[in-house]
Amino acid sequence: MIAIVDDDDLMRSALQGMLKAVGLPAQAFASAEEFLKSGQQRQAGCLIADIRMPGMSGLQLQAQLNAEHCRIPIIFITAHGDEKMRMQALRAGAVEFMAKPFNDEALLESVRAALES
């Protein structure tokens, strides 16, 4: 299962639809806190997360998962990223960092690579 964590309803819906259209099961969460409360951390084969969200950010979510020794491949997506943020995310263990709007095929390729890792 691919977990999607994004505070934007339209983005969550679009990502979930895109993944399901190619046969990849996905579950969407409106916040990092909702994802953590769901208990789905260990079932997720990959996590697509926005970096900037109200409450816990994507980077804080990544730190929490690392603290729990939960090594989910994380693909960050953001409309507000810069090179400094990209490097911070990659140093913390993200497998990909994509700026919105992103190419759907590039995202799917990153998801497939993350699932195979």
Residue ranges, per PLM feature:
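Short, conserved "switch-loop" micro-motifs in signal-transduction and mechanochemical regulators
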Residues: 68, 79-81
